[in-house]
Amino acid sequence: MSATLEPLKKSFKAQMLEARELAITASVNRLLSEKGFDAMTVDEVAAEVGIAKASLYKHFNSKEELACAAMVQAIQKAQAYLEDLNAQSAANTEAEVEGELTSVALHKLKASTRWTLQLKLAGQMPTLPSHNSSLRASLMASRPYMDGLMRVSDLLGAWIVQAQKEGFINAALPPITVLYTLYARACDPVVEFLKMSELHSNEEIIEMVMTTCFDGLMVRKNESKLDHHTH
């Protein structure tokens, strides 16, 4: 009679350490979103989580490691959302949005950008300086982060190329330019400026940023899809 092996249960101490790391990462995520990497301090993170600075260093050795952990969490969250989006209507090339037929690929690009802006307005989108070499090195050395980033880029890239083939996004733009344009929405200062003005609701801000972003990427109305395919 064979005995079934039960998965080993985590000890109470291991569960507590994991819960603390999640709390630390959530705090870092929020502080990076609100203040950015340069202004955020390790003392702030420790105080917000309610632990001593020395205890925090038992989990993460540096400020760069803290930021890296938050970015891993963010990229994995983005990957999960995009994978779910990719699974929807996989066999279809057209979707009906507000009574009009549009490209499924374009619809997914817009949905992913809208999701990014919603997180940003909710203070859940960490932003990092591009010029910090030690931070960049930490991210480049993180396998979970790089794997997630590659998968996210592959998914978005495939939708961009498809939308260009279908004549919805300007094919004169290199796909990498479109990809970076969409990535830039995660750190777009226009979103913060509009929110600080208190003149518009979050949904209005999202619609305005979506319009300025995608209207610049779309094929012009006077350019027919037929002309696009013949060039």
Task: Kindly give the residue locations of the regions a language model identified.
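C-terminal peripheral helix-coil segments that are non-catalytic and often amphipathic
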Residues: 1-7, 107, 111, 154, ...
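Short hydrophobic/aromatic patch on the recognition helix
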Residues: 50-60
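Amphipathic alpha-helical segments used for helix-helix packing
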Residues: 110-111, 115-140, 191
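Basic, helix-initiating cap at the start of DNA-binding domains
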Residues: 1-35, 39-48, 65
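Amphipathic alpha-helical packing segments from all-alpha helical-bundle domains
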Residues: 79, 83, 123, 137-166, ...
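Alpha-helical DNA-contacting segments of helix-turn-helix folds
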Residues: 67-74
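Hydrophobic alpha-helical connector segments
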Residues: 69, 83-122, 179-182
